[in-house]
From Swiss-Prot:
Protein name, per record: Adenosylcobinamide-GDP ribazoletransferase
Pfam families, alphabetized: CobS (PF02654)
Free-text function comment from the UniProt entry: Joins adenosylcobinamide-GDP and alpha-ribazole to generate adenosylcobalamin (Ado-cobalamin). Also synthesizes adenosylcobalamin 5'-phosphate from adenosylcobinamide-GDP and alpha-ribazole 5'-phosphate.
Species for this entry: Bradyrhizobium diazoefficiens (strain JCM 10833 / BCRC 13528 / IAM 13628 / NBRC 14792 / USDA 110)
Keywords (A to Z) from UniProt: Cell inner membrane, Cell membrane, Cobalamin biosynthesis, Magnesium, Membrane, Transferase, Transmembrane, Transmembrane helix
Membrane topology: Multi-pass membrane protein
Lineage of the species this protein comes from: Bacteria, Pseudomonadati, Pseudomonadota, Alphaproteobacteria, Hyphomicrobiales
Amino acid sequence: MIPGTETIRNVIADLRIAASFVTLLPVGSSKPAADGAIARATWALPVAGLLVGLAGALVYKISSRLGLTPNLAALLALATTALITGALHEDGLADTADGLGGGRTRERKLEIMRDSRIGTYGVCALILSFGLRWSALAAIANPWLVTLALCAAHCAARAGVPAFMSLVPPARPDGLSASAGAPPGRSVAIAFAVGTLVLTLALGPGKALVGLILLSLAGLILARLAIRQIGGQTGDILGAFEQTGEIVILLVAAAFQMGR
């Protein structure tokens, strides 16, 4: 066997696993049953996010070239990223808002989060999520800066997921998050490094630092809420974390875009 072949195969396998779990891209990998495979592959989540961001940026660029306004181009870019991911993270955000906002007991909150129907809290959360991201992209306007912002947001938002999974215990023993297991330290470190690198290259050191601080604070608040109300994290909580990350990074990019 050629030296390094097994390592390359593992990297490719992890990339396919990550992409298959957070996108609808035809990567040729079904959800794996091997123990520890999902947790190990979490390092590749920011890489999968980078691909999603690039797809949204491409649509924004094409829309701008066709003469569409920044508002319409931003809307199409968001629609593209939602289609590629199957609105997986948006669904998690809505379920989290409904569960944490609507249930009185831990059991009822978890029951609501598993319900496929969407409630008032979920609708409001989705409106705010799409509205804030749409407004941020439209404010940035410049196609090149939008590309950098989308890549940074989708990459960094997923880069924190392994750490969140590692630090916050599963809320129930039978959920997807519990079955995946806690990511090993190596996966957490690689994901963080990839996310930080992309964020820094895309937005610059200053804005990247602001984004990391705000994203960490948002993650701590969400973790505290999840532990207090339902005893830990679920797949829906992870989706809400990703959406929060996108919003934070895009708002940072929009707020400081004039300073580039």
